[in-house]
Amino acid sequence: MAVKERVGVVVSDKMQKTVVVAVENRAPHPKYGKIVVKTRRYKAHDENNEAKVGDRVRIRETRPLSRTKRWVIAEILSPRTA
């Protein structure tokens, strides 16, 4: 089975070793055809507390790490600009 990966933006880093990543999904509306943007928020494990708010990151699905955390940060694609 393929490993699920998502790319998103860190929206919260207030927890220890955990960040919240917002992932946008763009798809056309089935009836009207307009592109609809849906945002899903995932809690991801950040072992070294490297990711900061605004960073673009790639997350990878993993075993359950807590009640709501099933993703881990694979890499930081682009750090936020000051």
UniProtKB/Swiss-Prot annotation:
One of its GO terms (molecular function) is rRNA binding. SUPFAM superfamilies: Nucleic acid-binding proteins. PROSITE patterns: RIBOSOMAL_S17 (PS00056). Disulfide bonds: none annotated. The keyword Repressor does not apply. Keywords: Ribonucleoprotein, Ribosomal protein, RNA-binding, rRNA-binding. GO terms for cellular component: cytosolic small ribosomal subunit. GO terms for biological process: translation. Pfam families: Ribosomal_S17. Gene3D superfamilies: Nucleic acid-binding proteins (2.40.50.140). Transmembrane segments: none annotated. One of the primary rRNA binding proteins, it binds specifically to the 5'-end of 16S ribosomal RNA. Part of the 30S ribosomal subunit. Belongs to the universal ribosomal protein uS17 family. This is Small ribosomal subunit protein uS17. It comes from Thermosynechococcus vestitus (strain NIES-2133 / IAM M-273 / BP-1). The lineage of its organism: Bacteria, Bacillati, Cyanobacteriota, Cyanophyceae, Acaryochloridales. The gene is rpsQ.
